[in-house]
Swiss-Prot record:
CDD domains noted in UniProt: OMP_decarboxylase_like (cd04725)
GO annotation, cellular component aspect: cytosol
PANTHER family membership: OROTIDINE 5'-PHOSPHATE DECARBOXYLASE
Gene this protein is translated from: URA3
Pathway membership: Pyrimidine metabolism; UMP biosynthesis via de novo pathway; UMP from orotate: step 2/2
Top-level taxonomic group: Eukaryota
Record-given protein name: Orotidine 5'-phosphate decarboxylase
Organism encoding this protein: Kluyveromyces lactis (strain ATCC 8585 / CBS 2359 / DSM 70799 / NBRC 1267 / NRRL Y-1140 / WM37)
């Protein structure tokens, strides 16, 4: 895992998106990504307004929104990202052949490539998925874009492990500046070959151990000491009975303390 500071990694990173993200993480002293799965734009924007100061990244699933529109959802979301200095990650989990994902990424109702700094993909269809998404981004925007590969998942019984994970890491090596890292539970190596992948970890909870649908939670310390750079927290921030402001600050502090511990530990 990386024991360097976020800023020093930003200075040498091959990806403009990763560099930007690492810099703002240090500036805001946060490695918290808020995962906000809500059904209305109004609810989403209200939560972002509250959590914005505490996060480095916002993870969305815009296809859950009942009232999505480019003008009504994306435009105000981008304004909040600018105001609070965080990036946007649409958790689309692309999983088709190159040409299809290119169209899914750039077209349709959501036009993800136009507004989402980061997206992600499964490795199941091979390296063509990376090439297709990169081409899509280049065709519709001059803004830098980044891709995360899904190497490991936090759900019980996930098939993403062993040879599958290894194959996904090999696919990530096909494009150093577009593939910025992984959704994973552990460090994915690569440093000796010149890669500095960002590891983003879902299934992080300070209070809960899991849910009835197979989600399994791990503690902030556990994931950061294991190599995670960004903790992804969803219901822990805004579930019923929780105050998003209080929880945002709590998770931000816990994540930052764990990161400080990691970079200052004797190596």
């Amino acid at each position: 895992m990386s024991t360097k500071s976020y800023t020093s990694r930003a200075e040498t990173h091959a990806s403009p998106v990763a560099s930007k993200l690492l810099r703002l993480m240090d500036e805001k002293k946060t490695n918290l990504c808020a995962s906000l799965d809500v059904r209305s734009t109004d609810e989403l924007l209200k939560l972002v307004e509250t959590l914005g100061p505490y996060i480095c990244l916002l993870k969305t699933h815009v296809d859950i929104l009942d009232d999505f529109s480019y003008e009504g959802t994306v435009v105000p979301l981008k304004a909040l990202a600018e105001k609070y200095k965080f990036l946007i990650f649409e958790d689309r989990k692309f999983a088709d052949i190159g040409n299809t994902v290119k169209l899914q990424y750039t077209s349709g109702v959501y036009r993800i490539a136009e507004w989402s700094d980061i997206t992600n993909a499964h490795g199941v269809t091979g390296a063509g998925i990376v090439a297709g998404l990169k081409q899509g981004a280049q065709e519709v925007t001059k803004e830098p874009r980044g891709l995360l590969m899904l190497a490991e998942l936090s759900s019980k019984g996930s098939l993403a492990h062993g040879e599958y994970t290894k194959g996904t890491v090999d696919i990530a090596k096909s494009d150093k500046d577009f593939v910025i890292g992984f959704i994973a539970q552990n460090d994915m190596g690569g440093r000796e070959e010149g890669f500095d992948w960002l590891i983003m970890t879902p299934g992080v909870g300070l209070d809960d151990k899991g849910d009835a649908l197979g989600q399994q939670y791990r503690t902030v310390d556990e994931v950061v000491s294991g190599g995670s750079d960004i903790i992804i927290v969803g219901r822990g921030l805004f579930a019923k009975g929780r105050d998003p402001k209080v929880e945002g600050e709590r998770y931000r502090n816990a994540g930052w303390e764990a990161y400080q511990k990691r970079i200052s530990a004797p190596h």
